[in-house]
C-alpha cells in the first residue's frame, strides 16, 4: 500500500534534507565509543555500535540526532579514510587471517588476505604491509585489507628497524653498485696531494666526505682550504645511480646502522677521503680574517688531494684540552690541529656577534648488542673538535651560497624565514607578557630576529625561547637564494656532504659548471619537494626506531624507585612531555599524576605552565625529577610520574 507512494518518498526526502549534518574527524577511545571532532572546536559523541562503521582518524560526514539531551553523530559518508597503506601484526586462527594495525588507537583486528603474487605463508605474529580494500561506509559489510608484503616474523630481534622502514616505505639496503669509472676526465684538477689535509670524524665513520688544510698568512689571517669528496665524478647525471640517489635523497641514519644514499663501494671507498689515498674533490679556498670574517677571495676549483691523517673527535679534543693520552702523528699534523682551533675560535666569535650560534645540545647514541638489544645509551657532548668541523663546514656552505647566488642566481638553498608573518603579533604579545618589548615588523627582519635570539640566549632559562618557538616557520629547501634566520645568515647552501645528501650533489654539479664556465640549468622544483619529503620520512623513521629502543631500555625501570632528571619540553591539556637528560628518552606525565584533583590542575599550552589552584608549579623548560611509572610496549610510550 505504501510502495511507490510519492507522498512517502517526498516525506523521506524532506527528512533527509532537514537532518543536520557535520563533517569532521573520528577520534577513537580505548573504551569502544568515539567522538567526531569538527574544526577542532566542537565534538559529538559516537556510540560503540556506530563506531564499528568507522575507524579512528577517518574523515566523515555524519547526521546529528539528539538522545536524552545529548547530540549524537551517526556516520553516513566516508570523505577520506584514515588507513590506506599500513603495517601491522598478523593473527592466524585456523586458516583465517586478520591484521591488527600498529597504531596506538587502532586495536581491532581487520580481516585480510594476501594478494595473489605474495607467496609467503603467514603465521601468527608475523609483521606485514597491508592496503585497505573494504570499508563499511563504502557499502561493504566489514573492514577488509589486502596483505601486500611480508616484513619479518615476530621473533626477529630487528623488528623495530624493519617495521619502521616498511611503515615509511623506505629502503632496507644499500643500492647495488653499478660499474662506475671516473667520468669527468675533461675537468682540470689541481694537484694538492702534497698539502697536509686531515679528516676529523667519529672513530667508526667510513664515509669521510670532508678534509681540511690551513695556511697561516703571517698577518693574523688564515687561508682555509676545504676539500669535499666528489661523487659526481663517478655518478653521471640522470644515470641509474643518479636516479637512485635522487629517490633516496639522503643517507638514512638509524640507531645502530645506516642505509646509504649511494652504493657503499662509492660512499665508503672510492669517494671516501681515506688517509694516504688519492681522491677527487671539489675545493673551496677562503681567507679568514683575524676577527673571523670571510674575505671576498672565495675560490672554487676541482682537485686531487690525499688526506694525511684520519683524526677522531675525542682524540683531537683531548689533545687540545691538555689530555696527552693521544698525540698527533707528527708536528705537521699537530700544527694543522692548532691552526684549525684558532680558526674555530675566530669564526665562533664572529658568528656570535654577527650571526647566530646554536646552543650545544648533547647527542645520544645507542650502544647495541648483536641481537639489537640496547646495552647502553651514551651521552655525547659536543666538544672542541666537533666545533672545529662545524665552523669550517658552515664557512664552506656560506661560500657556496654566495658564489652560486652571484654567478648563477640559483642552487639548492636551505632557507628559514624566522617568524610566521601570520603569528608574529602573537609572538610579540608573549614576549611583552614576559618583559621583552619587540616590534612585530622588526622581528620579521634578519637583524631584528638575530637581536631577539641573542637576548633570549642570554636569559637564565629557556622558558621564553621554548614558548615562542611555535610561532616560527620550519626550514625549507629552495632553488633560489634566501636568508637562513636560524643561523643568522643571508644565504646558506650545503655542498659539504655529497656522499649522503642529494641536494649537495646537485650543488656540486652547479659549482663545476661555475668553475668551467659552462651553462647551468636551474634545478627543478620537484627535487626540493622530494628532498623535503625524504628528510621528513627519515626523521620520523629515526624517531620511531628510537622510541622502540627507549621503550625496551626503560621497561625494567618501570615501577621502580630509579630517579631521572628530566626537562619539560611541552605542556598540553592532558599533561607534560619531558626529556630524560641522562639518555634522551621522551616520556609523558598525565595531569592526574601531577595532582589528584583534576579540577584543581590546569595544564596550559598557551602560557607554558601548570597551575594547581591558580599557583604555577611547573613551567616549560623546568628541570624536574621523575620516576618511570609504566612502559607501554605496544605503543612504545613511556609514562613517568614526578617525584614528590
From Swiss-Prot:
Its main location: cytoplasm. Gene3D superfamilies: 2.40.50.640, Nucleic acid-binding proteins. This is Exoribonuclease 2. It is an enzyme of class 3 (hydrolase). It catalyses: Exonucleolytic cleavage in the 3'- to 5'-direction to yield nucleoside 5'-phosphates. NCBIfam families: 3_prime_RNase, PRK05054.1, RNase_B. Residues 561-643 form the S1 motif domain. It holds the Pfam family OB_RNB. GO terms for cellular component: cytosol. SUPFAM superfamilies: Nucleic acid-binding proteins.
